[in-house]
Amino acid sequence: MLMPKRVKYRREHRGKMRGRAKGGTEIAFGEFGLQALAASWITNRQIEAARRAMTRHMKRGGKVWIKIFPSKPYTAKPLEVRMGSGKGAPEGWVAVVKPGKIMFEIAGVSEEVAREALRLAAHKLPVKCKFVKREENGGESNEN
């Protein structure tokens, strides 16, 4: 499971997810990618489930890059506890994803295999996604 080795503070504010992604909006390493179309928190468990779905479909061939990292802790209070008496204990880790962010990249497999692998991964994520392909001039083409 992905998580930071150490953090300065155990608890963080929730923050706002306004606007589009500033960086990581183009395919950098692979040939095909999965791009977020909405803002969301993605947990380390969801990232791992998507990674497993992709690698299983590709029969462990090709290469997968995970371009998001769950660096934000989220907290939760126990069940049936009254309001107040402080913030809850850290429950898990999330990656903040904004629209336009490339979350996963794949190389070394055919387009049909990559498209199906990324479709399976998209079903594991709580955000609407689209398949993108690297163009010859360095950018990506927005195919659906």
From Swiss-Prot:
Q: Name one Pfam family in it.
A: Ribosomal_L16
Q: Which Gene3D superfamilies match?
A: Ribosomal protein L10e/L16 (3.90.1170.10)
GO cellular-component term (any): cytosolic large ribosomal subunit
What processes in GO biological process is this protein linked to? Answer: translation
Among InterPro entries, the record links this protein to:
Ribosomal_uL16 (IPR047873), Ribosomal_uL16_bact-type (IPR000114), Ribosomal_uL16_CS (IPR020798), Ribosomal_uL16_dom (IPR016180), Ribosomal_uL16_sf (IPR036920)
GO molecular function term, any single one? rRNA binding
Summary of the function given for this chain in its UniProt record = Binds 23S rRNA and is also seen to make contacts with the A and possibly P site tRNAs.
Name this polypeptide is given: Large ribosomal subunit protein uL16
Give the organism, scientific name: Bacillus mycoides (strain KBAB4) (Bacillus weihenstephanensis)
* Encoding gene per record: rplP
